């Protein structure tokens, strides 16, 4: 795939994932946090199942494989899906988007904790410390948590911790299966949708008379943010490598800040964009973006 082709997917992915936080806000106009979590996973699963059907890709087989997919869905979709939606009843979509950019730090921490072979390198420790500083600036720790809700902020950090824990598990248990990415993603989201269905039935809908834009936002969150986005991500990995694909995490907080400010009129405090830049720099450093191949070895 030529650079222009993967670059188009890269920009689309950054925009869609960056807009996910405003889509969550819109979904909360008529759904509960559990309803938002179920809606995005159900719509994403339906989208991926249709894509798999068109491409004649079969779903994974075997109880062990489905159990692993269920565990991954808990960590990537069910728990963080609920926590992000709950958090956005307390904090702005801008803050949620910025904290989400801390996911690489959580991933590194869990890799160090769970792997006996991987030891932290000096540049990774430096990146983690710089990232922690950036988070402190974003939250305005010199004045408590600024205007942020304590429970909302805690929920955000629990959510990205789930993301961080999921990646070592995926690498250890799912990657060796050598299944097609579309098959894994469809199975993962299907497991998540089944898990969340009872919570949606019990208390998933707050009201039925929401604005049309709220329904549109929920559709976009599920179909694109949790469905088609997986396909874009796989295409970028195949065409440009995982390093380029993971760089989209630097674009999403920028998009989240801009759309939250422009379309929702959310207030941006001076420390949030500055802290976000520090977080992005720390994440890039921790991922070895500024190191030569010799230094990474």
What is each stretch, according to the model?
Residues 2-6, 29-34, 38, 61-67, ...:
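Juxtamembrane helix-entry segments on the extracytoplasmic side of multipass membrane proteins
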Residues 15-45, 92-95, 165-191, 205:
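Juxtamembrane helix-loop-helix junctions in multi-pass membrane proteins
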Residues 15-16, 20-24, 49-100, 136-137, ...:
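Specific transmembrane alpha-helical segments of multi-pass solute transporters/efflux pumps
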Residues 19, 23-26, 30, 44-62, ...:
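Membrane-interface helix-cap regions at the ends of transmembrane helices
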Residues 35-46, 75-76, 84-123, 242-262:
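Specific alpha-helical transmembrane segments that line the substrate/conduction pathway
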Residues 38-39, 96-102, 169-193, 223-262:
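Helix-helix packing/entry segments at the starts of transmembrane helices
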Residues 48, 70, 102, 109-110, ...:
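Hydrophobic transmembrane alpha-helices of multi-pass small-molecule transport proteins
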Residues 107-109, 145-203:
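Transmembrane alpha-helical segments that form core, pore/gating elements
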């Amino acid at each position: 795939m030529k650079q222009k082709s993967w670059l188009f997917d890269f920009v689309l992915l950054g925009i869609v994932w960056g807009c996910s936080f405003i889509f969550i806000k819109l979904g909360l106009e008529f759904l509960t946090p559990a309803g938002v979590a179920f809606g995005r996973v159900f719509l994403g699963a339906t989208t991926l199942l249709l894509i798999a059907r068109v491409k004649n890709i079969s779903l994974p087989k075997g109880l062990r494989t489905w159990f692993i997919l269920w565990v991954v869905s808990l960590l990537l979709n069910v728990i963080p899906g609920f926590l992000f939606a709950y958090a956005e009843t307390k904090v702005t979509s801008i803050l949620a988007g910025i904290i989400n950019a801390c996911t690489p730090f959580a991933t590194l921490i869990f890799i160090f904790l769970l792997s006996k072979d991987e030891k932290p390198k000096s540049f990774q420790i430096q990146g983690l410390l710089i990232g922690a500083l950036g988070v402190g600036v974003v939250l305005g720790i010199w004045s408590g948590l600024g205007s942020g809700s304590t429970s909302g902020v805690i929920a955000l950090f629990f959510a990205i911790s789930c993301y961080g824990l999921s990646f070592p598990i995926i690498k250890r248990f799912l990657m060796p299966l050598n299944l097609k990415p579309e098959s894994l993603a469809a199975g993962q989201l299907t497991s998540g949708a089944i898990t969340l269905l009872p919570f949606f039935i019990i208390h998933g809908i707050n009201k039925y008379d929401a604005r049309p834009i709220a329904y549109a936002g929920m559709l976009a969150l599920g179909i694109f943010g949790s469905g088609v986005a997986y396909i874009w991500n796989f295409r970028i990995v195949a065409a440009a490598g995982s390093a380029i694909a993971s760089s989209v995490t630097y674009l999403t907080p920028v998009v989240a800040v801009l759309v939250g400010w422009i379309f929702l009129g959310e207030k941006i405090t001076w420390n949030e964009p500055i802290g976000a830049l520090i977080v992005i720099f720390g994440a890039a450093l921790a991922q070895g973006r500024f190191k030569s191949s010799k230094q990474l070895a």
